[in-house]
Amino acid sequence: MTEGNFVDYVKIHVFSGKGGKGSAHLHREKYITKGGPDGGDGGRGGHVILKGSKNLWTLFHLKFKRHVKAEHGGNGSKQRSSGSQGSDEYIDVPLGTVIRDTETNEIIKEITEDGQEFIVAEGGMGGRGNWHFKSSTNQTPRYAQPGVDGQQIDVTLELKVLADVGLVGFPNAGKSTLLSVITAAKPKIANYEFTTLKPNLGIVEYRDFKTFVVADIPGIIEGAAEGKGLGHRFLRHIERNSTLLFLIPSDARDIKKQYDILLDELKRYNPELMDKDRLVAISKSDLLDEELKAEMAKELDKELQLPYIFISSVAQSGLTELKDKLWQMLNREPV
């Protein structure tokens, strides 16, 4: 998937189908001059339905599909024949899609399961045929109901990636490299900021065929909560993660300060993110000798007051312990 193909935000206008008209037909047959009403009902208009698909990872297929329209219901006809029901229009979306009313910005629904369906615009009911209106005082009603108009609504679809662990760090912290060595993912890796322009997902194969999903969230910079850098576009993906893994390089000028800045950005974006489990991974630990690592650990024990681990993606050290800690946190086991 190329960067341009990762689309996590689209606006579309949906129209459900109008209900078909009821028929005002009067029965006509040879030798029967005063046949009664036999007009059939109109068919229901088609719904517009959003459906979750585990085979989609992006909203790219909707990037150029700004209008979605369902079929109108068929009109009723003689002999009480009902009109055909309008075909429903399905819109497949990836799991983790949030549906908002564009006008009010209100969340209407979230699609989180494969096959989950949600009617975003209901088709109009078909009108009733004239036979429904026959009475003792009106044996031949010539009135039939028109079909009910379909619904129209502007909706905004936002994708929030579904993953167990979210990798959080400044640009160029080595998140993509870590993801590539603990999973089979192949993210773009280069030594410049914002290499990652989309969340990359990787599946960690743990012991006894157990697995969990890690998402490499594009680099956060100071001010991201106000929209700087890649801003809100990617911060929302973190909302889905149950555990946050902060990646800070060992050669950072001040590890505690970097952690505090990252945490503050998340807090300002959404205070509820503070309820998530957190683990700090000190990367590039292959640059440290044992004496320096021990000295750094002593400082971190005082300052961080949360679990941390030294790792090296290049030397592939500390990675088994990292997987163990993440698995324990995901399953609420003592770390």
Curated annotation (Swiss-Prot):
Residues 70-90 are annotated as: Disordered. One of its GO terms (biological process) is ribosome biogenesis. It holds the Pfam family MMR_HSR1. The keyword ATP-binding does not apply. Residues 4-162 form the Obg domain. It is an enzyme of class 3 (hydrolase). SUPFAM superfamilies: Obg GTP-binding protein N-terminal domain (SSF82051), P-loop containing nucleoside triphosphate hydrolases (SSF52540). Its EC number is 3.6.5.-. Residues 77-87 have a biased composition (Low complexity). Residues 163-331 form the OBG-type G domain. One of its GO terms (cellular component) is cytoplasm. This is GTPase Obg.
